[in-house]
């Protein structure tokens, strides 16, 4: 199932309009640190920055049968410490059931097996219960909480829940996750 139909591929310039339309959806913006509507110019500048030598990130499009469904971002990549931060979202509301689980599995496999990272770090706004459960379901462990870390116009200050996932955890849990995904197919 995972080998042939689902994949992460590098984000390309041709993806920018689609990714911008996803990123500007209210449901996605509300889960981000910055929730303003992003202009095409701002989005293009961001993408140009990601293409520069020395940029510390990687950005992927998550696809099913070559059809884009979402985005996975790796930022603050430290080769020295073998650590990165991740972010993600499904942009297609009609994505098949289980798509988010496959996306998470592929992202973790990319980080730990292809990029040889030791740790993946996630940060989730306290009011994003779906993402909090998602991180736990994938095997992330809560490592801390940044109190009143982000200000949102409607909610005021929000805590940020910090998650970590170590490569040794991945080695223990990846087959369990893969088996669960195979059962969904």
Language-model-derived ranges and their functions:
Residues 29-31, 50, 93, 149:
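Alpha-helix C-capping/helix-to-loop hinge sites
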Residues 38-41, 50-52, 90-91, 180:
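Juxtamembrane/interface motifs at transmembrane-helix termini
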Residues 48-61, 70:
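A short helix-loop-beta-strand connector motif used in the catalytic cores of GNAT acetyltransferases and
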Residues 27-47:
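Conserved GNAT-fold acetyl-CoA-binding loop/helix
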Residues 1-18, 22, 63-185:
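Acyl-donor (CoA/ACP) binding surface of acyl/acetyltransferases
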Residues 30-32, 59, 173:
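Short, hydrophobic secondary-structure boundary micro-motifs
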């Amino acid at each position: 199932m995972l080998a042939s139909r689902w994949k992460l591929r590098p984000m390309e310039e041709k993806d920018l309009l689609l990714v911008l339309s996803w990123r500007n959806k209210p449901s996605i913006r509300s889960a981000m640190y910055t929730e303003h509507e992003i202009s095409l110019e701002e989005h293009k500048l961001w993408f140009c920055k990601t293409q520069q030598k020395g940029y510390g990130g990687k950005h992927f499009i998550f696809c099913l049968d070559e059809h884009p469904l979402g985005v996975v971002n790796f930022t603050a990549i430290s080769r020295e410490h073998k650590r990165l931060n991740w972010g993600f979202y499904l942009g297609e509301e009609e994505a098949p059931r289980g798509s988010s689980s496959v996306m998470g599995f592929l992202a973790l496999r990319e980080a730990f097996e292809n990029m040889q990272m030791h740790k993946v770090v996630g940060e989730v706004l306290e009011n994003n219960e779906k993402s909090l459960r998602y991180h736990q379901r994938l095997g992330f462990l809560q490592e801390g909480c940044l109190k009143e870390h982000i200000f949102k116009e409607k909610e005021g200050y929000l805590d940020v829940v910090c998650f970590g996932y170590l490569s040794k955890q991945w080695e223990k849990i990846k087959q369990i996750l893969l088996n669960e995904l195979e059962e969904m197919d």
